[in-house]
Amino acid sequence: MKLFHNKMSVLRNILVGTTIVVTASSAFAHVKLESATPTINASIASQPKSIALNFGGEVMLMNVKLLDAQRRDIPLNYQVSHDLKKTFEVAVPKLKNGKYTVVWTTMGTDGHNMSGEYNFTIKSTK
């Protein structure tokens, strides 16, 4: 009987430990950028009207920047909102031909910040 009780205690401890690890892993899973417009690493022929960032889960977009080829900041009219969303759209000013970098920072529901960047290029169709 004691042997059965010891085996059950070990089994219970394994199940509790596994549950804690799985719960912690999903709670701290970070949301990734799934897609964007202009598309990541795209060469586009015309001026985009906006930048759209599509994430795999709901986040707050804490910051978004647009940088030119020399990594100079191009002002965007973006105000931080505490709304949790999957998709954010930011208007873009008139841009010249060239390479641009979108830099973003989000905060997930777990309070962790995630950041990333991607490039796109505007090429003339002349």
Predicted regions mapped to residue ranges:
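N-terminal non-catalytic regions of secreted/periplasmic and cell-surface proteins
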Residues: 28-62, 124-126
